[in-house]
Amino acid sequence: MQITEKETVQEEQQKLLYPPPSFSTKCHISSVEQYNEMYKESIESPNQFWDKKAKEFLTWFSDYTTVQHGSFEKGDISWFLNGKINVSYNCIDRHLKENADKVAILFEGDEETMVKKVTYREMFEEVCRLSNLLISLGVGKGDTVAIYLPNTPTAIYSMLACARIGAIHSVIFAGFGYESIVSRVHDAKCRVIITADEGLRGGRYIPLKEKIDQVVQHCKLVQHVLVFKNTGRPTITFNPSIDIWADEAMLDHRPYCPPVWLDSEDPLFILYTSGSTGTPKGLVHTQAGYLLYAAMTHRYVFDYHDSDVYACMADVGWITGHSYIVYGPLANGATTFIFEGTPLYPTPARYWEMVQRHKITQFYTAPTAIRSLMKFPISFTQQSDKSSLRVLGSVGEPINPEAWRWFNTNVGEGRCAIVDTYWQTESGGHLITPLPGVTSTKPGSATKPFFGIELQVLDSKTGERLYINPDINGCKEISGVLAISKPWPGIARSVYRSHGRYLQTYMTQYKGHYFTGDGVKLDSDGYYWIEGRVDDVINVSGHRLGTAELESALVGCSICAEAAVVGYPHDIKGQGILAFCTLKEGYQEDESNVIMMLKKEVRNVIGPFATPDVIVITPSLPKTRSGKIMRRILRKIGCHESSAEQLGDISTLAEPEVVKLLIEKVSKVIPKTH
């Protein structure tokens, strides 16, 4: 997959880069013809296709009677009706007969000396003990359990223990602040929280139990807090009326717990994602359909084989961690690598040292991490042996062509397959992705749909399908909103306790379609290029943040009267957070102090990862005469699209002169990159 230096960026983007023939012969899917045949069957005969895959990938307690039911319009999508299954059994028990001593979890902590290997047998015993402990606390089928843990094996045990007994887990990212945790625990009605004393990341201790102590004061429904010792430092407070030392309590329970056989459509987990209304949505994923889709995408997209060491750099607090650290790999009997640290600690060579140390074969990370590593001398990348690598993956946001080429050349050394994966929390697994050894790639394009995914490019205003037809209109590419016209097994079934919101968000904008919320370009080769959100959601380093949630946090600061938040192009993160704030009348303070206070408020309310990159203090915001903030104008200003032609008509603004002021302010704090 080498690229000659003479080619221009545009030529590189449009040129098809073919996988080496030697690579293709060893893959699960080894030719374009095989992909086309399987894809055609998945679209034209979905019941036949998914019936075969459900029997190939999953072990059932009792068989299903119907492969699929329902439609987008009715919001009653169901898969593998009346089947009985247990996700924990599929991820652990069925591997014990032949692979009990195989490493299931390969963990490396914040320091490189913190390495732990957990076999399938050991994982089975840990999960069973924790399952029995939860049962002793009255947790059972349908109960919700909040998990607020660092990226360690304990998080995996906790998820699988819930799955084993039919409890519904709600994993909360350990970077979230107190108010974000409260809203999720309250919405999910969790009676039990599983946490740890502290996390350790980038050389810094992260207080976890301390935050949960605050949460418990405001969530009276919580009855028990299980506390694992992660750092073991004597820094936390312990309330014996509610807190339980989990490590010690588990020793009082048997290392065997029979799995509870569940209906295919019983909820497996709730995972909260940002919504444009400001209130996070608790997306509900169910048992069989989700597990099948996670396992199948993991095996095919990463071309996973039994001897591989598969590594995903995500956090279990996000859907990528759920699907591609935990459920997909373990359902396939894989060795899955989990990492508590950061790519830059203690040096920017950390990722590649881990690849050499553990002989990692598949490496899945975010464009943000890649771009951050590109800033450092190439010697950090070159000093480690990366010959074990076979597949490199990108996730969380579109990868820009420059980062794609750097990843391909300096990490993959021109011999690895690169899979730029597009998907969402809602989808459960990959929607658009290359397949190693099969799909010719273009830097920056997610390429082709996965099996069962029938994509449509729609006109955003009319909802009509757009077509490329060079013979009629000379059109060689089209742009519109990305929609999907057929259900797939991994799709989230609902928003927890708010099915109407689920329908309104995804199923009503374009009748008969699932609306992704993303814009897309389709080129004449049939390759899809994701162009970003079309709703009020910002994608920062692969984390989706609702602008309303950010604005609410800013206005929660005592000095802020009004706030408007938009995304802007960011070299490292993909999108940065740009906030425009007005202050309460009469408030006078040094602007740098004001900005510091506002950033601190967002860190406390949502979490450090949501801190605005740029805050502009302004006497007023661009509004229509009816009082509506014109975020379209703010987005253009953030992108330096500030000519009269680019801004469009601003005559409807109550104070059009504020636009000039904001253009001047933004030009001083956000440099033009081109």
From Swiss-Prot:
Name of the top EC class for this enzyme: ligase
An annotated Gene Ontology molecular function: AMP binding
Binding site for ATP: 396-398, 420-425, 518, 533, 544
Residues binding CoA, per UniProt: 201-204, 320, 541, 603
Source superkingdom: Eukaryota
Record-listed E.C. numbers: 6.2.1.1
Catalytic reaction list: acetate + ATP + CoA = acetyl-CoA + AMP + diphosphate
Ranges that cross the membrane: none
InterPro entries xrefs: Ac_CoA_lig, ACAS_N, AMP-bd_C, AMP-bd_C_sf, AMP-binding_CS, AMP-dep_synth/lig_dom, ANL_N_sf
Pfam families according to UniProt: ACAS_N, AMP-binding, AMP-binding_C
Record key words, sorted: ATP-binding, Ligase, Nucleotide-binding
UniProt record, GO biological process: acetyl-CoA biosynthetic process; acetyl-CoA biosynthetic process from acetate
Disulfide bonds: none
Family: Belongs to the ATP-dependent AMP-binding enzyme family.
Database matches in PANTHER family: ACETYL-COENZYME A SYNTHETASE (PTHR24095), ACETYL-COENZYME A SYNTHETASE 1 (PTHR24095:SF14)
Protein name: Acetyl-coenzyme A synthetase
Gene: acsA
